[in-house]
Amino acid sequence: MPTRWQAIGISAFWAVMMGLLVQRDVLPHWRLTPQPDFRALSQAEVLPVPVRWAILQTEHRIGFVETGWRRKPDGWCEFYSELELNPVELRGFGLLSSFLSTGAGGMLRCTSSFHITPQGNLDHFDIDVFPAESKPAMRVRGRLDRDIMRVSFRATGLSYDEDFYYEPHSLMTTSLVPIDKLPELSVGRTWEYRVMNPLARTTEVVRCEVTGEQVITWHNEPWQTYVVEQHYGRMRAHCWVKHDGTVLRQEVPFGWNTLVLEHE
């Protein structure tokens, strides 16, 4: 039987270990800080110019995307993007086969616009995909009907509709279009958002978790970042976010491969 001081020592050790476990596994889920959602992002600081990202395949630049926010006087906010991608560099990707088979040269372009209410809910969005300089080959439109997001995919010879429940304030974006800021992160925080893939004509739920911290090199300088693990179905990707919420680098599954978006 332990002595009195041994019992005190064991109890103190147990209390310290329990406190560390609660801090690691419980507190991140109970903190009242805002989740990374449209409400938090639309209220964050808006940069005066769009953010430009390089699209990299094994460190080879194959395109770019610009993202930005517009805050309107009536309280609405718009998250917009414009993407240009060289499809020649991606021959063999099933997602682009229908565009490459047309023989149109030049860059593949995609524009998107997500309109957020003053309450931080996505109200509607528009996505257009252009092969080269032609008219849009694919149009995607989404409109919130109460708590149901009604999405339509329209292309030559194709008409497809999809409905799903929209979680209030939750994020939604387009494949290869990164969210440029994720404020109020902490290790252990989890959330979900949806990604629209107009080329595959699908929407996908992405599950995210801040798994730890890591020092990365960005603009030839070391930066302490949060590491966000993102699950796209069976595929896994990562995102590196500065402590102030700025996203520096993000992996994006594209077909069966992974591209990297680098904040310029």
Annotate each language-model stretch with its function:
Residues 1-147, 155-164, 178-264:
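Acidic, serine/threonine-rich low-complexity disordered tracts
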Residues 151:
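Acidic, glycine-centered active-site loop in nucleotide-sugar glycosyltransferases
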